[in-house]
Regions:
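Repeat-associated, polar segments at repeat-unit boundaries in modular proteins
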Residues: 1-13
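Intein modules and their embedded homing endonuclease domains
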Residues: 10-198
C-alpha cells in the first residue's frame, strides 16, 4: 500500500537524489551538504561553525570542513557508481565505452532515440562527477561552506538557552524531574557544554 502512494520514495533511492545538487553551484552544493548534515552542523555569528559530536555542539571549523570532505566522499562514490551504470547501459545499447567517453557531434548524430537518452544520462552523471571533483578542492569547499552558513544559522542566544537541561556524557537531564528527567542527547537542544561524569 505505502509503495503505491503518491510521493513514495523507495529505500534504495532515498537520499540518492539529495546528493546531487539542483544546480551545480556553490549554493547547490551547500544545500546538499546541509540536507545530509543538518543535525550535525550549525553556525552562529558569535561562534562561527559548530559540529555536533554526538554529545554536544563544539566550535570547530575543522570538524565542519571534515564533514564537507565526508560529504564529497559519498558524492564521489555515488557519481562513480552512476557513471559506471550509465556506461554499462550504453554498452548494452551497442555503444562502445570509449566512443561514449570521447563523444563529439558526429557521435551524437549517429545515436538513435534510446541511445541518445542513455548518452544524456551518462553526460549528466559525468558532469556531476566533475562537479564533485571540483568541490574536493579546498578553495571550492570553502565557498560551499560559506554558502551554507545562512542555511544553518542560529541565534547565539539559542545555544545553551535552557538552564534546566544538564548535559552529561550519558544523556541529558531535565533538572526539575531529577533522575527521571533523563533523555538521550538531542542536537536540537543546542547544548555546547557537557559534564565530565554521567
Amino acid at each position: 500500500k505505502v509503495a503505491k502512494q503518491e510521493g513514495y520514495v523507495a529505500p534504495e533511492a532515498y537520499g540518492k537524489q539529495s546528493l546531487i545538487p539542483d544546480d551545480f553551484s556553490d549554493v547547490g552544493e551547500a544545500r546538499t551538504f546541509v540536507e545530509q548534515y543538518a543535525d550535525e552542523v550549525a553556525f552562529t555569528v558569535a561562534t562561527d561553525y559548530l559540529r555536533y559530536n554526538g554529545t554536544y555542539w563544539e566550535e570547530s571549523e575543522h570538524a565542519v570542513t571534515l564533514a564537507m570532505m565526508e560529504h564529497t566522499d559519498v558524492q564521489l562514490a555515488e557519481a562513480e557508481k552512476q557513471v559506471e551504470a550509465a556506461l554499462q547501459n550504453l554498452e548494452h545499447l551497442g555503444i562502445p565505452r570509449e566512443a561514449a567517453k570521447t563523444g563529439g557531434k558526429k557521435f551524437r548524430d549517429s545515436l538513435d532515440e534510446a541511445q541518445t537518452a542513455a548518452y544524456q544520462q551518462y553526460q549528466y552523471y559525468s558532469t556531476f562527477q566533475a562537479f564533485v571533483m571540483k568541490y574536493r578542492n579546498v578553495r571550492n569547499m570553502t565557498n560551499a561552506l560559506d554558502a551554507a552558513k545562512p542555511i544553518v544559522l542560529h541565534n547565539p542566544e539559542a545555544l545553551d538557552s535552557n538552564p534546566m537541561l544538564l548535559n552529561t556524557p550519558g544523556g541529558t537531564y531535565y533538572l526539575p524531574e531529577g533522575l527521571n528527567g533523563w533523555k538521550p542527547t538531542d542536537p536540537a537542544d543546542l547544548l555546547t557544554k557537557v559534564t565530565t561524569v554521567v
